[in-house]
Design a protein with these regions (language model features):
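Alpha-helix/helix-capping structural signal
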Residues: 1, 25-28, 54, 72-73
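Secondary-structure junction motif
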Residues: 19-37
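Residues at the C-termini of beta-strands that transition into short coil/loop
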Residues: 24, 51, 87-90, 103
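Hydrophobic hinge/microswitch elements
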Residues: 42-85, 92
Length: 129
């Protein structure tokens, strides 16, 4: 575990000793997080980049480095103890998904059921954040 021992990950400044795992579609995430957390002396550009978030999370589970996670994607692994949240600081994301459909489609029962379901998932994720 990266958290244990005298060289473990105890505070955000310790990240300078660890590989940062980046998600290619969010190249600035580490810089934004470090700045928001007030962390100095950590080069946000270093580390390994992955095309898919789940690959970065798997690398973190394998002990290859530290990744920034999005709650809906990492929650099962946090609950199972495969991942841990090393710091109390959390940063909300401006990232969003949009459900789009033609106006008349909402009259279709399946479309309305899907919309209601996806909105309920979003509300649960917002409460967990």
């Amino acid at each position: 575990s990266l958290m244990k021992g005298p060289n473990g990950l105890g505070k955000p400044a310790d990240l300078k000793r660890f590989t940062l795992l980046h998600i290619g579609s969010f190249p600035d995430d580490w810089q934004v997080w470090l700045t928001a957390a007030g962390v100095k002396g950590v080069d946000a550009s270093r580390g390994v980049s992955f095309d898919f978030a789940l690959a970065a999370y798997q690398a973190a589970m394998d002990g290859l480095g530290v990744a920034l996670g999005r709650n809906p994607l990492v929650e099962p692994d946090l609950k199972a103890g495969r991942l841990v949240v090393p710091f109390e600081f959390k940063r909300s994301s401006d990232f969003a998904y949009y459900l789009v459909y033609p106006p008349e489609a909402i009259r279709r029962r399946k479309i309305k059921a899907f919309r209601d379901w996806i909105v309920s998932l979003s509300e649960v994720a917002q409460q967990a954040a």
